[in-house]
Amino acid sequence: MEVRVAAEVASFLASAPAMIGLLKRGHGRPVLVLPGFLAGDGSTAPLRGLLRGLGHDVHGWGLGRNIGPTDEILDGMIHLVDELRARTGSIDIIGWSLGGLYAREVARLAPEVVHQVITLGSPFQTTGPEQSRVGLAFNALHDRHSDRVMIPRIPSWAREPMPVPTTSIYSRTDGIVRWHHCLNRHLPTAENVEVRGTHCGLAMNPAAVLVIADRLAQKAGRWRPFRPPLAVRGLFPHSDVYEPPAA
């Protein structure tokens, strides 16, 4: 399924100028965008550019390639969040794949700072990296990962409900992670939005971008679940809810 990523990228680049005029505009609140495993800021540059055009104060993470939770990456994210908080008081965080797991944990540690979390193909219901197609590569870098996190085993508390509003954007045709590992439990401030596409193309998937722009346009304290406009409702097939396995 991931072979379709080139088509998603081409569609995004072709439609981006027109999309700017159709998407909801922001309020200037800082938005931090975290890349997926083995990716860096270059992978999120198209999305960040579009969001900047919508009036958001968008930031990449500036920590190079995401090779997993090293001490440098953990400390760098803490410093970046503190820096953004000092400027404005609250931020939105978008995390792609592994970046979404980071985003959720930042929100757990500092819920007073994070306005909301939006994840793209992030398998936060998994129990370990071996349940994805990049598990071998992740485990090969284990010696560089920090002792401050429980890797490769992901603790059960990491899969618990979030203290801030959260939107999980996922695809049933994801070729890297299992889609049901990307689902929030049913809560008033948690939602799951399915789009049609690939894992590696999610940040440039037009339907996903529409969801992101809609979520970021909400004012602080006024979070509501996503409701697609009637004209594009066909882009959003399902809205699944995570069901914990029986004991």
Predicted regions and their residues:
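Helical cap/lid subdomain of alpha/beta-hydrolase-fold lipid enzymes
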Residues: 108-109, 114-247
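Short secondary-structure boundary micro-motifs
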Residues: 6-7, 15, 101, 151-153, ...
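Flexible, membrane-associating and regulatory peripheral segments of lipid-active enzymes
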Residues: 1-31, 40, 44, 49, ...
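Serine-dependent carboxylesterase/thioesterase catalytic core
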Residues: 29-35, 40-42, 46, 50-65, ...
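Short amphipathic alpha-helical segments, especially helix-boundary/capping motifs
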Residues: 6, 21-25, 52-58, 77-80, ...
